[in-house]
A protein has these predicted regions:
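SAM-dependent methyltransferase catalytic region
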Residues: 1-148
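Sequence-level detector for compositionally biased, low-complexity segments
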Residues: 54-58, 89-90, 108-216
Length: 216
């Protein structure tokens, strides 16, 4: 089925609602069931990028910091720490960007199933910005294979091609873009210190050239 829901909000139960709102409650309950129990094996999309996130739910706030309040406070991947130690960032604002929250949600959902694929087109900031080193470590500990294609096109950084030529965005936005595919395999035993194998590539140039390469 197709459900209207806010993925970044914790799943809820609905009891004793007025009859005229029952249809909305039924849809919310169905969506909550998917969040909690359905064996979701593929999460894909192009989530919004917003450093000034309007999604300020407590569940996601704690999940980003390594605590799953939907599972009795169980410890989980912490984007605000590396090797168990706090990042110590003076301004960790960008870890609260909406696209980071959607990646964290998708990671959590695939972990609950035990295996699956996360495929997102997002802001490319998390690939190399030091603020995201806890996020990168968490993703590498959670998945077995990671495929990253940095499409660049960041006009804020005035990016150029390696030869000094013009580099354009694939969208009509200023922020650079990346494609990330994260694979968690079934039946794989994970030990402390295990990290995903990562494949990384860059794509520079004009928009049409990038489209041609992506369609090849």
């Amino acid at each position: 089925g197709v459900y209207l829901t806010n993925s970044l909000e914790e799943a809820h139960d609905f009891d004793n609602l007025p009859l005229f709102t029952q249809w909305l409650a039924d849809e919310s309950l169905a969506a909550s069931e998917v969040k909690r129990q359905a064996p979701v094996m593929v999460v894909l999309g192009n989530p919004p990028y917003s450093g000034h996130s309007a999604n300020k739910g407590e569940w996601m706030k704690h999940l980003l910091r390594g605590t799953d309040t939907s599972d009795h406070g169980a410890l989980t991947g912490n984007y605000f720490a590396v090797d168990g130690k706090p990042l110590g960032e003076r301004n960790p604002k960008w870890l609260n960007d909406d696209y980071v929250k959607f990646i964290r949600f998708a990671q959590w959902r695939i972990e609950r199933t035990g295996h699956g694929v996360l495929a997102f087109v997002t802001n490319h900031g998390y690939l190399d910005n030091p603020t995201f080193r806890g996020m990168r470590q968490s993703l590498m500990q959670s998945f077995d294979e990671i495929y990253l294609l940095d499409l660049h096109g960041n006009s804020k950084k005035k990016e150029k091609t390696p030869t000094g030529g013009k580099d354009e965005n694939v969208f009509d936005i200023q922020q650079g873009v990346a494609i990330g595919i994260f694979v968690r395999k079934p039946g794989v035993k994970r030990w402390t210190g295990d990290m995903a194998k990562v494949w990384n590539a860059d794509l520079y140039g004009g928009r049409r050239d990038k489209y041609t390469t992506l369609n090849a």
